């Protein structure tokens, strides 16, 4: 399927003042209600990464799980789950980070990766970059390396993709929105 940014953007709903005043939330649930848009999204990532040299896909809680798991399945790669604090049952490593809403903690199972593994980290969007930077730190603490950070949406005005690139992490997104774009 040929990528069509207009179709993709038309399936991402802008929700003003959610979860707090002044924030425009980018709701991707309509994308999942459109089989065409979902297939285009997954296929676009699969085409980009089909011949790439990485060993695992790491998906961010919770919306990163949705596309990350589909791409991991299509590429036959192991899926590593990065969860919000207190959601994983076994031994974990944790990393504090700042979001656009406040401080949070990201966790991963301590046995998820091995020395030398290479991880494509996935989230639904790149805003401040805090979640993906925390995931990258956890990947490195486990002895692995970050291949790239990928997302459906980039919000470049919030600086996350720049922060990731400044930390030596390549980024890729299917589309970008200006903060005031509806």
Swiss-Prot record:
A GO molecular-function descriptor: adenine phosphoribosyltransferase activity
Cited InterPro entries: Ade_phspho_trans, Adenine_PRTase, PRibTrfase_dom, PRTase-like
Coiled coil start-end: none
Catalysed conversion reaction: AMP + diphosphate = 5-phospho-alpha-D-ribose 1-diphosphate + adenine
Pfam families linked: Pribosyltran (PF00156)
Entry EC number(s): 2.4.2.7
Highest taxon in the source lineage: Bacteria
Annotated CDD domains: PRTases_typeI
A biological process from GO: adenine salvage
Keywords: Cytoplasm, Glycosyltransferase, Purine salvage, Transferase
Cystine residue pairs: none
Primary location group: cytoplasm
One of the record's GO cellular component terms: cytosol
Entry's localization field: Cytoplasm
Gene3D superfamilies registered for this protein in UniProt: 3.40.50.2020
Pathway per the UniProt entry: Purine metabolism; AMP biosynthesis via salvage pathway; AMP from adenine: step 1/1
PANTHER family the record matches: ADENINE PHOSPHORIBOSYLTRANSFERASE, PHOSPHORIBOSYLTRANSFERASE DOMAIN-CONTAINING PROTEIN
Function as written in the Swiss-Prot or TrEMBL entry: Catalyzes a salvage reaction resulting in the formation of AMP, that is energically less costly than de novo synthesis.
Assembly and interaction partners: Homodimer.
Family of this protein: Belongs to the purine/pyrimidine phosphoribosyltransferase family.
Protein name: Adenine phosphoribosyltransferase
Organism: Pseudomonas paraeruginosa (strain DSM 24068 / PA7)
